[in-house]
Amino acid sequence: MGRAFEYRRAAKEKRWDKMSKVFPKLAKAITLAAKEGGSEPDTNAKLRTAILNAKAQNMPKDNIDAAIKRASSKEGNLSEITYEGKANFGVLIIIECMTDNPTRTIANLKSYFNKTQGASIVPNGSLEFMFNRKSVFECLKNEVENLKLSLEDLEFALIDYGLEELEEVEDKIIIRGDYNSFKLLNEGFESLRLPILKASLQRIATTPIELNDEQMELTEKLLDRIEDDDDVVALYTNIE
């Protein structure tokens, strides 16, 4: 991954440490999961994962419980919507939102793109084929070692659950599999009693591009505006 990417990720992680921004997005994911599959984590894998990701960000239990209860109230009237856009330098953007007001959401997104010359929202389906959807799980390397497993053991154990790729990054291990293998991979971790640090469904560009520092700085202004929107829960680009 290029220096511009690392600069962007470092800047984003620093800003996302502001819990006032992170918690509402996590709460929306919990509420929607509970609304779709019920309020019991034991029987709702999507809710279980949303709670796990919230705990990884130190979200208080009271906030988590409140988000689950919200699913049965009028406040829980959320829907998932995906938007696509293009920016300068060949940048492609896919934006995943959870919103109770799609009209507001698309109006806000269009305003962000309009502030960036050369950027625009495009019809849904225009860019989706240029991204692969993947299940991505993270765990700590020392948790694997605590189970007396080598990386080869872990890879072999999870292949039958849909593992496609295993990568070691510093103190973490990243597992990737097909989008449709999310539930199965989750079951694989549970069968090993291996704690999951983070789990998500991601979109990975089939043909990533590299930007220089100046191009990245200009592009990040748009990406920051998008990610700051409370209705946006995930943003993917083709930037390497």
UniProtKB/Swiss-Prot annotation:
One of its GO terms (molecular function) is DNA binding. Keywords: Cytoplasm, DNA-binding, Transcription, Transcription regulation. It is found in: Cytoplasm. InterPro entries: Integrase-like_N, TACO1_YebC-like_2nd/3rd_dom, TACO1_YebC_N, Transcrip_reg_TACO1-like, Transcrip_reg_TACO1-like_dom3, YebC-like. Its main location: cytoplasm. Belongs to the TACO1 family. This is Probable transcriptional regulatory protein HPSH_00820. It comes from Helicobacter pylori (strain Shi470). The lineage of its organism: Bacteria, Pseudomonadati, Campylobacterota, Epsilonproteobacteria, Campylobacterales.
